[in-house]
């Protein structure tokens, strides 16, 4: 496991323990049961594909460990509306505070502002976080294969499916992909950022895409800035993309989203 993930796991496990003390599992489960039903995340992406469009998972991200503050003018509700107006299929909302200045409150606000399904983008180590995600309205969660062993990944995926949520399995190399393909989720994301070096290259997606079965929904993540980047990944069979930083830096987010999704005539 990379140094960055080791540090993140340490503070995450402290966060989880504190959350359990403040709000025991039974209490958060009761809230999750009363939450509005999950909006189909995979379903929304497949609907875009059926219409001949790219499926964009548009990310609401204030900051990152590698780039620092990304957007000072940060209004999750307004950003969600801009993404929806720009043609995004789904939202991804960072809820990790120490590294990304995220918050579960941002997830609640963003989802309430639109009809799009939302992913809780965070580092998941415990099924408690899955229930917590659903209690705050999340329709999908992220499993980072580099952060978990096979048993942990299965437990977290099972917990999400039990709550009617979708799961994005994130991989960065062939061994992680092999492990992810043993799980049930149809959605496999290839992170073009190496979590050990933070180097980003679209060649990662190009190398792994041919290894992903055609019945899986492939997602390209990180390093995607232009329509040319989307076209490059589309050539290896990807039609779903998770994009955050490049859109977060734009003054007119809706227009930037539309421009990114515009296919060459």
UniProtKB/Swiss-Prot annotation:
Keywords: Amino-acid biosynthesis, Aromatic amino acid biosynthesis, Decarboxylase, Lyase, Tryptophan biosynthesis. Pathway: Amino-acid biosynthesis; L-tryptophan biosynthesis; L-tryptophan from chorismate: step 4/5. One of its GO terms (biological process) is L-tryptophan biosynthetic process. GO terms for molecular function: indole-3-glycerol-phosphate synthase activity; phosphoribosylanthranilate isomerase activity. Its EC number is 4.1.1.48. It catalyses: 1-(2-carboxyphenylamino)-1-deoxy-D-ribulose 5-phosphate + H(+) = (1S,2R)-1-C-(indol-3-yl)glycerol 3-phosphate + CO2 + H2O. It is an enzyme of class 4 (lyase). Belongs to the TrpC family. NCBIfam families: PRK00278.1-2, PRK00278.1-6, PRK00278.2-4. This is Indole-3-glycerol phosphate synthase.
